[in-house]
């Protein structure tokens, strides 16, 4: 019985995270269609292996430098490999006063929801 409950909890957690993931990707695409700046925060090597059309590569380690040139009210969609680094960039940019930023998650997640 205990393992059945654990399995049920695991299934719910996996399903819930998938729903959230697709929602954030869908929101990302909606913003992109409205003209948001698309920023890939992965490394240059990862970016060269594939990226979204019209994306610019501002690696997470360089976010503080690159975003000094961008209006803080500019709509921005961030993504990376899994959503972790773009989440870190989101938190940093929010703390810097950026008002229209969105963490769209990972590249594959975005591609699957296009």
What kind of feature is each model-predicted range?
Residues 2-7, 18-36, 45-74, 84-114:
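Rhodanese-like catalytic fold shared by cysteine-dependent sulfurtransferases
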Residues 14-15:
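Sec-dependent N-terminal signal peptides of Gram-positive bacterial secreted proteins and lipoproteins
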Residues 80:
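Short cysteine clusters
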Residues 39-40:
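Structural scaffold elements adjacent to functional motifs in cytosolic proteins
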